[in-house]
Design a protein with these regions (language model features):
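Bacterial N-terminal signal peptides that target proteins for export
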Residues: 1-10
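N-terminal, helix-rich and Lys/Arg-enriched segments in bacterial and organellar proteins
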Residues: 6-7, 99, 152, 204
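Bacterial Sec-exported substrate-binding components of ABC uptake systems
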Residues: 21-105, 213-241
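Residues at the C-termini of beta-strands that transition into short coil/loop
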Residues: 51, 62, 123-126, 187, ...
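Extracytoplasmic substrate-binding proteins
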Residues: 92, 148, 158-161, 165-246
Length: 246
């Protein structure tokens, strides 16, 4: 009986060791070619996966005005999986709990997902109307128009959500890399359609490990959009609307 117990223990340890080896095995970058989520309206991102991998890649295309043939990839790590061989972009832990939003648009997306409470800092808090942010402005930090890196380090964020403004943003991302702070460009403002802009909430839901919820939330938006569009189809006098003005 004792001999059988020893054999069973050794077998169990071997299985655990093998599982650990597979668990931490690196997947090649070329293996991430399976479509996990292909947007219907947005053109600036897609989510890719690989066989036998829980982690995913978010690919962001041309994330600022004037960008051409620019593709950035972000590794969304799950279950301790390592970035694929040859990957040099940011690694972001799935289920991000501490998020810095450098645009109010990202706040609205996280709010739609029911995850606005994960925001630890914003840019320009005095110009944000979100009820949760206003109610917690004593604890949510303000990065200001330019990132306060000392403050940012103290927050230990899981990810900083950025908008791209061309070469001027390079200094920011270089500094974030130096500080080992994960970041992701969100290019929703470059989408031509309102639905394309809204669909970026699915990309954010991948960061918070709630992709299914993100897809469900977004699926309802085109229905409401079409209903409002139909409602105004017969309006003859159409006013000019100006927004994002001082």
């Amino acid at each position: 009986m004792k001999f059988k117990s020893i054999i069973s223990t050794i077998t169990l340890l071997c299985l655990l060791f093998l599982a650990s080896c597979v668990y931490n095995k690196k997947t090649s970058l070329e293996a991430f070619k399976q479509d996990v989520y292909t947007p219907e309206y947005a053109t600036g991102f897609k989510i890719l996966g690989a066989k036998n991998a829980q982690s995913t890649l978010i690919q962001v295309s041309n994330p600022w005005q004037g960008a051409k043939n620019v593709t950035m990839s972000y590794f969304i790590s799950r279950n301790g999986e390592l970035p694929p061989t040859g990957f040099t972009g940011p690694t972001i832990p799935a289920g991000a709990q501490h998020i810095v939003c450098m645009s109010s648009s990202y706040i609205a997306m996280l709010d739609a997902l029911g995850q606005v409470d994960r925001i630890v800092a914003v840019s320009g808090i005095n110009y944000i109307a979100n009820p949760y942010i206003l109610a917690h402005r004593d604890s949510i930090k303000d990065m200001g128009p330019e990132i306060n890196y000392e403050l940012l380090l103290g927050l230990k964020p899981d990810v900083v959500l950025l908008y791209g403004i061309g070469d001027a943003q390079t200094a920011v991302t270089d500094k974030l890399k130096e500080l080992a702070i994960p970041y992701m460009y969100v290019g929703e403002y470059l989408e031509e359609s309102p639905l394309g802009k809204a669909e970026w909430l699915v990309a954010l839901s991948e960061l918070t490990d709630s992709r299914d919820k993100g897809i469900d939330v977004f699926r309802e938006i085109p229905k409401r959009y079409q209903a409002l569009k139909d409602l105004t189809a017969s309006v003859e006098q159409r006013p000019t609307v100006m927004f994002n003005t001082p």
